[in-house]
């Protein structure tokens, strides 16, 4: 008997649907939840816009309530359902875009290899002068000897190999 591999991706990505409204009443067909929520949000927005226009111009759009309540929200719901920028839901896309804009673009943060660069906004970056490092105590003399690593600080807390009485080492010297 061979091994059966099941792919549940299609079943898990099935949108949530509403059919049973109350215990005694159910719809004859299922309605997807997200487009239904979008529709009622767009009905509220269109009705508010229509009401504002009617307050300013009382005789404008006398018999257009059918278009405002059913037509425009239905069109906007279908449009929002079809548009998938970068393969994402449009609301998730706008949320991610707002997060990027307010947390990265406006503060002018810069990243390199997913790490924040702290000194990218500095006008002038100063480097410390180089010093000549000398430590011949555990020098490897033969190829068969091991190269044991030492700490950069000795027991007294001083840096090993830096000669403070010597002058600065110039890396650009010829």
Curated annotation (Swiss-Prot):
InterPro entries: TcpE. Keywords: Cell membrane, Membrane, Transmembrane, Transmembrane helix. The chain crosses the membrane at residues 29-51, 66-83. The keyword Nucleotidyltransferase does not apply. It comes from Bacillus subtilis (strain 168). It comes from the Bacteria. This is Uncharacterized protein YddD. The keyword Transmembrane applies. It is found in: Cell membrane. It is a multi-pass membrane protein.
